[in-house]
């Protein structure tokens, strides 16, 4: 099965966007999960600035 050149370009673009989203979204996702799943919930200011 042959994939057209346009389809290849589109797939490359989608993978590049996915790579960028994963790269910049991984740490905020982990922080958000830790914040929302912890018990008791920490104050948001403490999460943003630990010295506050």
Curated annotation (Swiss-Prot):
Residues 37-52 are mitochondrial intermembrane. It is found in: Mitochondrion outer membrane. GO terms for biological process: protein import into mitochondrial matrix; protein insertion into mitochondrial inner membrane; protein insertion into mitochondrial outer membrane. InterPro entries: Tom7. Keywords: Membrane, Mitochondrion, Mitochondrion outer membrane, Protein transport, Transmembrane, Transmembrane helix, Transport. Pfam families: Tom7 (PF08038). The chain crosses the membrane at residues 20-36. GO terms for cellular component: endoplasmic reticulum; mitochondrial outer membrane; mitochondrial outer membrane translocase complex. It is a single-pass membrane protein. One of its GO terms (molecular function) is ATP hydrolysis activity. Residues 1-19 are cytoplasmic. Forms part of the preprotein translocase complex of the outer mitochondrial membrane (TOM complex) which consists of at least 8 different proteins (tom5, tom6, tom7, tom20, tom22, tom37, tom40 and tom70). Belongs to the Tom7 family. This is Mitochondrial import receptor subunit tom7.
């Amino acid at each position: 099965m042959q994939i057209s050149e346009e389809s290849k370009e589109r797939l490359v673009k989608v993978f590049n966007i996915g790579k960028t989203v994963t790269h910049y979204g991984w740490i905020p996702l982990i922080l958000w999960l830790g914040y929302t799943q912890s018990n008791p919930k920490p104050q948001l200011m403490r999460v943003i600035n630990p010295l506050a």
